Amino acid sequence: GWKDWLKKGKEWLKAKGPGIVKAALQAATQ
C-alpha cells in the first residue's frame, strides 16, 4: 500500500538526501 511506499521513501531520503543536497549545491555554484 501507499504507507509502505511512504516508508520506503523516507528510508531512501535518509540514505540519499545528503548526497542529493550536496549535488544540488554544487550545480548551483557552477
Curated annotation (Swiss-Prot):
Name recorded for this polypeptide: U1-poneritoxin-Ng3b
Top-rank taxon, per record: Eukaryota
An MF annotation (GO) of this entry: toxin activity
InterPro entries: Poneritoxin
Main localization category: secreted
Family to which the UniProt record says this protein belongs: Belongs to the ponericin-G family.
Tissue: Expressed by the venom gland.
Keyword hit for Secreted: yes
Taxonomic lineage: Eukaryota, Metazoa, Ecdysozoa, Arthropoda, Hexapoda
Keyword Secreted assigned: yes
Pfam families linked to this entry: Ponericin (PF07442)
Keywords for the protein's UniProt record, in alphabetical order: Antibiotic, Antimicrobial, Fungicide, Secreted, Toxin
Localization of this protein: Secreted
GO CC terms in record: extracellular region
GO terms of biological process kind: defense response to bacterium; defense response to fungus; killing of cells of another organism
Role summary: Shows a broad spectrum of activity against both Gram-positive and Gram-negative bacteria. Also has antimicrobial activity against S.cerevisiae. Has insecticidal and non-hemolytic activity.
